[in-house]
Structures are given as structure tokens and as C-alpha cells.
A protein has these predicted regions:
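Structured, non-catalytic alpha/beta "coupling" segments that mediate domain-domain communication
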Residues: 183-203
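Long, compositionally biased, glycine/small-hydrophobic-enriched stretches that function as flexible linkers
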Residues: 11-164, 171-173
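Extracytoplasmic/secretory soluble proteins
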Residues: 203-206, 225
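Hydrophobic alpha-helical hairpins/lids featuring a short glycine-rich hinge
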Residues: 174-177, 185
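Active-site nucleotide/adenylate-binding loops and adjacent lid/helix of ATP-dependent enzymes
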Residues: 60-61, 189, 213-287
Length: 287
């Protein structure tokens, strides 16, 4: 039996919009690469585009070379400058194109990346698109953005590329390590020591297994300071316990009225609102 198809979003376009089936970030040695620890893995259904490689989409080559001219530096399997353009002109599948777009827009946002792989799966039209990232939130955003960009190029509709690039720059500033922590991590990488960020701030694990050490900014795990700071932060404590499959209440950090509405759709009622740094029930509202 064939898959049930949805009505097209763009009535004049024969292909159905692509769908991201799964999206995750690798943070250590993985099945795609032992050496490259920071990879985005996207399971992508290209729908009817399986029957329409790039050479079968009128105007696609001209549109992508106009929107992303710097991709001329992508060698791909051709091993020469402009190699990827040659692949697009001869005909390649959309998962492969999205891989290269995701890498390029990260580069345009100031984060040099270069590793990518696209592999078919046992399900027709479904691909695993894998590419490297520098900052995890940026990599996840780049995956979604690359799919949107590719769809716009297929449909021949305008797309504000600069807005996405600016948002990636902002995400990088929000998530990047501070100068002291970044210096330690950079030195560890230079010595072949893998690292893993354990939260959105400066808590970092160096090494794996029995040899692992942890730092928070410039404080090491040889003191109890890290544990004390985590215990004083409700959200961070909850995230840490949850990562070890310890049951914790659903919760979100809220800073705006819109954020509160979004959080309530996840948490539901009844709920408790309390200061993130409060104690003894001070400032708590129940309802």
C-alpha cells in the first residue's frame, strides 16, 4: 500500500513539501564518525522529490547558484572547486542538497563546518542527512532552515536568507562558551581530549569514562563548588536529574507572557509558578 499523501502547500507545485521525521544532535563518538563528535542527524522524507532530482526541477540550478554563490567552494565527491555545482547540474537528490545548504549557512554565520554525509534508508524517499556543527542550537536551526531554503528554491518563491543567518549568529552568541571556558576546551581539543557540554552554560565534561573530569567556567570538579551551584538552580538541577532518567515534574523557565502561554501548553494545569532562585516557598503561586 502506498503512503497517504497530504494536499500540497503550493498548489502550482507538483512535489509535496518535505518532512523532517527526526532531528537530533550527536555529542560524542557515534555511528557516523568516531573522530567527529559534533554532528546533526536529520531523518528526512523528501516525498515525491525522490522522482525529481535537481536536473528535473526547472530553474533550480540557476536559483541556488544565485542565492548561495559561495557554495562554489564545495568540492563534494568531485574533488575540485565547483564540484557540488557539477553534481547539481547533472542531477542529485534533495537530501544531498540540504546537507550542503546546512553546512554553508553555518559558514556564512561565522561557524566553519565541513563534514557532511547523506545516506538513503530502507524506506523509499527517506534519507539520513548528517552534517557537523559548532554550536548545537545553531546546528539544529540550520537543519530546519536548510529544508525551508531548499523548498523555496524548488518552488521558486522568495526567501529571506539573511534573516536566518542573523538568527544563527544570535543563537551562537547566546550559547557559545565564555572566553575562559573556551580557552580550556580549545587546549583540551588540541591535546586530543574529547569534550561534552552538559548544559547551556559553562558546565563541561572533559574525557570519557573513568578518566572524565568536569569544569564549570574555570572551577574544577575537585571541589564541591560545582555541586553547590547546581543545587541552588532549580532548572539546572531538574535537567540534570532528568538526564539520568530520574522522574521530575514537567517545567519550563519563563521570561515573557508569550513564553508563559507556550509553557502552559506543555506543563498543563494545575501548575506552580515560582522564582527560579527562590526558596522556602517565597514568591510561589499555585493554581
Amino acid at each position: 500500500l502506498g503512503r497517504t499523501r497530504r494536499p500540497p502547500i503550493f498548489p502550482t507545485e507538483q512535489a509535496y513539501p518535505m518532512r523532517i521525521l527526526e532531528l537530533k544532535a550527536m555529542r560524542g563518538p557515534n555511528s557516523w564518525s568516531v573522530r567527529r563528535h559534533h554532528l546533526i542527524v536529520m531523518r528526512l522524507d523528501i516525498e515525491d522529490l525522490e522522482q525529481r532530482p535537481t536536473d528535473k526541477i526547472p530553474g533550480f540550478y540557476e536559483r541556488i547558484t544565485t542565492m548561495l554563490p559561495t557554495m562554489v567552494s564545495h568540492r563534494c565527491s568531485e574533488d575540485h572547486e565547483g564540484g557540488f555545482w557539477s553534481r547539481v547540474k547533472r542531477g542529485t537528490w534533495m537530501g544531498h542538497v540540504i546537507e550542503h545548504i546546512a553546512l554553508e549557512i553555518q559558514t556564512l554565520a561565522g561557524m566553519e563546518t565541513g563534514f557532511g554525509r547523506t545516506r538513503s534508508t530502507r524506506e523509499k524517499g527517506v534519507y539520513n542527512v548528517v552534517f557537523s556543527y559548532v554550536e548545537e542550537p545553531v546546528g539544529l536551526f540550520a537543519a530546519k532552515s536548510a529544508v525551508r531554503i531548499a523548498q523555496a528554491l524548488i518552488d521558486g518563491t522568495p526567501y529571506d536568507l539573511e534573516a536566518d543567518i542573523q538568527q544563527m549568529r544570535e543563537l551562537r552568541e547566546e550559547s557559545r562558551l565564555g572566553p575562559s571556558t573556551a580557552s580550556i576546551v580549545h587546549e583540551a581539543v588540541g591535546r586530543g581530549i574529547p569534550y561534552l557540554r552538559l548544559n547551556g552554560q559553562s558546565l563541561v565534561q572533559l574525557g570519557h569514562g573513568v578518566h572524565q573530569k568536569r569544569i564549570r567556567a574555570t572551577i574544577t570538579s575537585k571541589t564541591s563548588n560545582i555541586g553547590v551551584e547546581i543545587a541552588c538552580d532549580k532548572e539546572e538541577t531538574k535537567q540534570l536529574l532528568e538526564s539520568y532518567e530520574i522522574p521530575v515534574p514537567k517545567g519550563r523557565v519563563v521570561r515573557t507572557e508569550e513564553g508563559l502561554k507556550d509553557a502552559l501548553t506543555v506543563v498543563g494545569y494545575p501548575c506552580v509558578i515560582k522564582p527560579i532562585g527562590g526558596n522556602h516557598g517565597r514568591g510561589a503561586t499555585i493554581g
